[in-house]
Structures are given as structure tokens and as C-alpha cells.
Amino acid sequence: MGHQNAAVSENQNHDDGAASSPGFKLVGFSKFVRKNPKSDKFKVKRFHHIEFWCGDATNVARRFSWGLGMRFSAKSDLSTGNMVHASYLLTSGDLRFLFTAPYSPSLSAGEIKPTTTASIPSFDHGSCRSFFSSHGLGVRAVAIEVEDAESAFSISVANGAIPSSPPIVLNEAVTIAEVKLYGDVVLRYVSYKAEDTEKSEFLPGFERVEDASSFPLDYGIRRLDHAVGNVPELGPALTYVAGFTGFHQFAEFTADDVGTAESGLNSAVLASNDEMVLLPINEPVHGTKRKSQIQTYLEHNEGAGLQHLALMSEDIFRTLREMRKRSSIGGFDFMPSPPPTYYQNLKKRVGDVLSDDQIKECEELGILVDRDDQGTLLQIFTKPLGDRPTIFIEIIQRVGCMMKDEEGKAYQSGGCGGFGKGNFSELFKSIEEYEKTLEAKQLVG
């Protein structure tokens, strides 16, 4: 099962994965019928934060701050009395990234006083060091805000979730609990006793960083849209996660839908009741001309893990202009742009959703565009964020699908415009070309 494998296991045949798992037989994009049974087993509100484990939180956080336009909002480190780990919170709109690195265990080896305890109660020196050694820079926790973290944990475990950290109440205000998601990644539940606490602070033990001491960066990124995992076998992972959360299947793609002549994947998306918490999961396809990019990830990551984070922008053109300015000076690089023919055919594919000037800007910035029967998706992918060809970031903007809630307030439905099914082949080609450059250099070496 994906969440249990520390090492990479080869599928004998890609049909052995999701197709053989009870309740999850992939039928492909064209035959899949989207339904929302509103089957969550506990009340889910939204994504709360993403925690990265790293070797040095200060420098990694600074790079993400500069590259994504996220401001330093809170800290828990030696200066706040935390002798266990350094943690720095970056925010942009509702998006929260937390970067955590261990201090020497000897600092807190004796009697730990309240002023020296870890702000993240589940933090463990050995686990963090082992994680970083095995995976390099990566996501440790996908945190979702729930109505009651203790209840969510109990229900999850009762429905097959593997416990990672039992519920802990912080300052009689916030409850945190964790279960295993896949690989060494955990699904973290966060709940607040009172709404005013939720709005006033991130977590107890963190001190706010005043605006005056944080350079006011903002490139237009507003929230986390979806968090994607890679596993050796899709079926068991889907059965496991859907089994303890109750999340329903929102979309699916098979190698026939999204592969190239050289490689492919199978993928399915799990969603919460309001479809604002989206968890796609991928598996590699074997027996193709080239090794699947998912298999490459699994080998370099030493097992299952989080592949990429899709960040929602309110203006993708502004976001990309700002990010590309910084690509060569400490920011993030992007995958190669598609050929000119892609943009010549774009008007035919997306209709009047984008003006001619906007299509021209998409070409200049390398933005991919796709649409489904409900809305339009604009997207672009970075190259891997660190030394290994593993985790990367997707910047997206969704257009359309506007709804009204019971109070008449407008909102955009989750997953509007789909997941770029029409762009998968372009993305695969660019990743294949990127991997070929690495292989060529390895052969020369």
C-alpha cells in the first residue's frame, strides 16, 4: 500500500493498481461521471497549511518568500524560546507555508521547560532527520482545518487510518492530530475552540512577525488549490484515504487519457464535500518506452510522497511576471514552454474566454490553458524546487463556475475548469525533455 512503502515497489502491470482495488476501477476521463455524494465522515473546512521539513528553515523560507511573493508572518525558534525546532510561517492570502528544521537534540535533552517545548507537538528529531535524509526538501504535513480534530482523528482511525500523532490540545484553544497519508507524509487535523482564536493566530507558540520587519511581497497568490501525491500503486492508496476521510472521487485520468507515446500515469482526484480540499494521487505506468516521470519521482524520493502543490492566483499574468523576474536571482525556474503551434490552436480550443491579447500573454509567459464543460483553467509548472527531481509547484487560475451561497454571496466552485487534462501531454513532453537533459549529462559524465 502506498502509505506503507518506504522503498519503491515496481508494478508488474499498470492495471494491477487502481483497477484491482475494490471500489476503485478506473474507467478513464471520457467515461467517468462526476458525482458528489457529500460523503465526508467528519466536517472539513479548508486547507489550513503545508509544512515542509528541511535542513535549514531560515534559508529555505527566504527562498520561497522571494520566489512566490509570500511574507513572513510568524516564527517559533530560539528567539521565542523554542529549543527543539525552528519554524517559519509564510503567508499569501489564505495560503500558509510552514518551514521546519531541527535544532540539536542536546539543547532540549534535559528537563524540558514550558518555554522550550516544540510549537508543533508531533515534531520528532529522529523522524525529521530521517525524513530529510531520505527525501531531501519535501512536504511532511498536509494540514486541513476541521470542525473537531479529536473527533476527526477518532473517526479516521476507526475507519482504517494509521495514527501518527494523537490529538493534543494547545493552550486550551487549538487541537492538532495526525494520521498517515502516504509515504512519510501525514494528514494533519487542526481545529479551533473559538473563531476569534483562528483569526488572531496561526498556532500557539508562534509569535507574529510585525509588518515592519517583513518586506511586503505579494505576487497575487491567494490559496492552495490542490496537493498531489505520487504512490507506487494507486488503488490501495485511494481505498485507504477515501476509506477514512469519506472523500469522493472528483476526477480521474488513465495513461490513455494523458500519456505520450513514451510515458504515462494513472491518476484520481479525491475531494471533500464542498470540493475545496482536493487530493489528487498518481501512480506510474510501466512497460512504456521511457520510465514514467512518476517512477522517477518515486526512485529519487525513496518512496511515496507529495509531488506538487497547486497555488491559486487571482491574476496569473501578474504572478508569472513577478515570478519570472526572479527565476535567475533566487526564485524558481519553469518548465519549457510549449511550441508556437499550441498557442495558434488555443482560440479554437478555449473560445472567447480569453482575448487575443491574453492569448499572446499566455504565449509570452508559457501559460497552458484548458477547459471543461464548466470553466477554464490556466496553469504553469515550475521545475523541481530542490536538488532532486521530485517536488514542484503549479501556479493556476480558474475562470468561471461562479455560484451563490445561501446568503447570496458569490463564490467559485472547487476544481473549476478541471485539472488540465488537455495539457497533460504537453506537460509530459516538457518533463521528458527536462529529464533527457539530465540523462545526457549523466552519460557524458
Swiss-Prot record:
Residues 46-192, 223-383 form the VOC domain. It catalyses: 3-(4-hydroxyphenyl)pyruvate + O2 = homogentisate + CO2. Catalyzes the conversion of 4-hydroxyphenylpyruvic acid to homogentisic acid, one of the steps in tyrosine catabolism. Fe cation binds at H226, H308, E394. Pfam families: Glyoxalase (PF00903). Pathway: Amino-acid degradation; L-phenylalanine degradation; acetoacetate and fumarate from L-phenylalanine: step 3/6; Cofactor biosynthesis; prenylquinone biosynthesis. Residues 1-20 are annotated as: Disordered. GO terms for cellular component: cytoplasm. Its cofactor is Fe cation. Binds 1 Fe cation per subunit. One of its GO terms (biological process) is tyrosine catabolic process. Keywords: Cytoplasm, Dioxygenase, Iron, Metal-binding, Oxidoreductase, Phenylalanine catabolism, Repeat, Tyrosine catabolism. InterPro entries: 4OHPhenylPyrv_dOase, 4OHPhenylPyrv_dOase_C, 4OHPhenylPyrv_dOase_N, Glyas_Bleomycin-R_OHBP_Dase, Glyas_Fos-R_dOase_dom, VOC. Homodimer. It comes from Arabidopsis thaliana (Mouse-ear cress). Its EC number is 1.13.11.27. It is found in: Cytoplasm. SUPFAM superfamilies: Glyoxalase/Bleomycin resistance protein/Dihydroxybiphenyl dioxygenase. Belongs to the 4HPPD family. GO terms for molecular function: 4-hydroxyphenylpyruvate dioxygenase activity; identical protein binding; iron ion binding. Residues 1-11 have a biased composition (Polar residues). The gene is HPD. This is 4-hydroxyphenylpyruvate dioxygenase. PANTHER family: 4-HYDROXYPHENYLPYRUVATE DIOXYGENASE.
